[in-house]
Amino acid sequence: MIVLTGHTLTIDEVRRVVYERERVAADEESMRAVEKSRAAVEQAISNGRTIYGVNTGFGKLADVRIEGSDLEQLQINLLRSHACAVGEPFAEDVVRAMLLLRANALLKGYSGVRPAVIEQLLAFLNTGIHPIVPQQGSLGASGDLAPLAHLALAFAGEGEAMYQGRRMPAAQALSQAGISPLSLQEKEGLALINGTQVMTAVGALAYLEAEQLAYDSEWIAALTIEALYGIVDAFDARIHAARGFQEQVEVAERLRRYLAGSQLTTRQGERRVQDAYSIRCLPQVHGASLRALRYVKETLEIEMNAATDNPLIFADGTALSGGNFHGQPVAIAMDLLKIAVAELANISERRIERLVNPQLSEGLPPFLSPQPGLQSGAMIMQYVAASLVSENKTLAHPASVDSIPSSANQEDHVSMGTTAARHAYMIVQNARKVLAIELICALQAVEARGIERMAPSTRQFYHKARRIVSSITADRVFSDDIEAVAAWLSERANHHFLRDEAKA
């Protein structure tokens, strides 16, 4: 059971709720803060105060005063009018993360909602009702309005949801789960959609998969190093200490550990003086990506515990309009994640080229083919890798430098953070397939060199991977192999092995 406080949620707890379906509860003290914030809203209404989104219109219509008899209708109207996102729906895992993050943000006690709103969010999480949320339509300020409106409508029994593996009207899902629809009161519709929980949810899952991929990439690269008689002097601790980047030091240390005892690696001057950069500069490049990912994690964990509503309602009755809904911090972090993971794929593709190119592969069969000429072997796998990394370069274009004014120029600068997060997730999927191709090629190459000459650690990894993909003995449909290996690399159980070995 994970207890949400509004202040302490971690990426690892997101992982447990999303993937392991761990149950969630609200901290009692945090709920008391929620009650105080709600009482402040109700007192302000009774005093006749004007508060944005409570008794006014929205966006450019903020100066339109709404009378008391229409205040609850205002909130459901807001959700209905804003629920105009388009495109394919987010995966259920992403929606689970949205529900979790929205509940945690409301528990900070600055949104003026009733505890019943948070209880509804947690009921959805714990019973497995996942609203249908289209992916496209957010500008990332005022938060993720359009997609979050779809999420919030389901709490009131409108829209659609996935429940027990079936897509159905949200009202039907609520009925089957024994949950009553939520009747929204003043401020609550706005509080449910004014925030960055879509970009942060997508970003958190992209980060979790990117972290896994970073560890995977080092193991795969270690096999390639052996297959190409790589020079291990480049990983000497003194080189990396002389520069000082901790992540670079760590990558070099892991490579030394994985390759310890190998009879395939060489020393400088034995076969050649220096390796190409895609081998020699592995710690520098992979380390830089790892350093970027750590910044991304830090940013996400701050945002996961942030109040991103507007206005914020304080316990003393103060209502302050600000801009915490602006997704720029997450947008920039997602753009950085895109670059970091795209680079892991870029350098992997260059190592693939060295494995299949007979002019670069130190005597390996051309394209790793059993019968070069009659059979093409891994030739087109390198094409696919090149295609994927080229697509990543397009996706890696920063979304955060783009902005289109909206709401009659009231919202004249936006973050495009959800676009950045969605593209980051796409890049991770593409990069995993590139690394799957490198692994398939590296497995074939080390076989040609002699697996008995491999390091004990890499040989263990070799045997694990060979359970997923067999040796290339004749041409076959390699897309099946690529997809199978990519799926294996994405498995969390496999990640635990690789990560734990990496951190040994």
Curated annotation (Swiss-Prot):
Its EC number is 4.3.1.3. Its main location: cytoplasm. One of its GO terms (molecular function) is histidine ammonia-lyase activity. Pathway: Amino-acid degradation; L-histidine degradation into L-glutamate; N-formimidoyl-L-glutamate from L-histidine: step 1/3. One of its GO terms (biological process) is L-histidine catabolic process to glutamate and formate. InterPro entries: Aromatic_Lyase (IPR001106), Fumarase/histidase_N (IPR024083), HutH (IPR005921), L-Aspartase-like (IPR008948), Phe/His_NH3-lyase_AS (IPR022313). It catalyses: L-histidine = trans-urocanate + NH4(+). It is an enzyme of class 4 (lyase). There is a cross-link at residues 141-143 (5-imidazolinone (Ala-Gly)). Gene3D superfamilies: Fumarase/aspartase (Central domain) (1.20.200.10), Fumarase/aspartase (N-terminal domain) (1.10.275.10). Pfam families: Lyase_aromatic (PF00221). Contains an active site 4-methylidene-imidazol-5-one (MIO), which is formed autocatalytically by cyclization and dehydration of residues Ala-Ser-Gly. It is found in: Cytoplasm. Belongs to the PAL/histidase family. This is Histidine ammonia-lyase. It comes from Geobacillus kaustophilus (strain HTA426). The lineage of its organism: Bacteria, Bacillati, Bacillota, Bacilli, Bacillales.
